């Protein structure tokens, strides 16, 4: 699977996955294809060992592409090419903007929305992972201010995420438009 990914992408994502360096792997342009190929490799290992074929699949964001593959909606090469294009567009948008993301744990949705609504700058909810964990996103400075305000307002934990951009925010609008073309 990893060799096929290298061939489709025209670069060694396998070497990056197995040998690093970590700094290269953390770049959006590499992270997304690496996660997808690893997810597909895990799926194929499970299929080979158990013969399991899912009745339905689901995925969120990058995970949608693994779900498309698992459901036989797209073949491997198409999935990898799509995610490579997506990663490139998001990487370009992230380098043009200074964004950040934070996981907020132990605070209600309404309280989080109230706090971030009072912060100057662009900050919004990216993901409702569970009732106990919500991810915020936006301009790095606004997210940093929101982090402090959320701590002061009683969030149990405020965890800045090690990402290279303000994904799932308006900072990615350009990437969304280009990817849809």
List each model region and its residues:
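Helix-rich "cap/lid" substructures immediately adjacent to catalytic or cofactor-binding pockets
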Residues: 1-58, 136
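A short acidic, glycine/proline-enriched capping/turn motif at secondary-structure boundaries
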Residues: 42, 64-65, 89
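A short small-residue
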Residues: 18-25, 66-67, 157-161
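Glycine-rich nucleophile elbow surrounding the catalytic serine of serine-hydrolase chemistry
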Residues: 60-69, 73
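Alpha/beta catalytic cores of group-transfer enzymes, especially the acyltransferase/condensing modules
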Residues: 7-11, 71-181
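Residue-level recognition of oxygen-bearing side chains
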Residues: 30, 62, 141
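Short, glycine/charge-rich beta-strand/loop segments that flank catalytic centers
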Residues: 22-23, 58-62, 87, 99-103
């Amino acid at each position: 699977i990893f060799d096929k990914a290298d061939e489709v992408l025209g670069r060694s994502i396998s070497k990056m996955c197995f040998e690093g360096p970590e700094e290269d792997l953390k770049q959006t342009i590499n992270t997304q294809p690496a996660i997808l190929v690893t997810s597909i490799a895990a799926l194929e290992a499970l299929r080979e060992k158990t013969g399991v074929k899912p009745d339905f699949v689901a995925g969120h964001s990058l995970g949608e592409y693994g779900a498309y593959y698992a459901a036989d909606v797209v073949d491997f090469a198409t999935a990898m090419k799509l995610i490579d294009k997506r990663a490139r567009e998001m990487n370009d948008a992230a380098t043009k903007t200074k964004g950040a993301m934070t996981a907020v744990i132990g605070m209600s949705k309404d309280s989080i929305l109230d706090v971030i609504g009072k912060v100057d700058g662009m900050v919004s909810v990216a993901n409702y992972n569970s009732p106990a964990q919500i991810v915020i996103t936006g301009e790095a400075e606004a997210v940093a201010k929101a982090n402090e305000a959320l701590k002061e307002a009683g969030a149990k934990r405020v965890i800045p995420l090690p990402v290279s951009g303000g994904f799932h925010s308006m900072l990615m609008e350009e990437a969304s438009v280009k990817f849809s073309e």
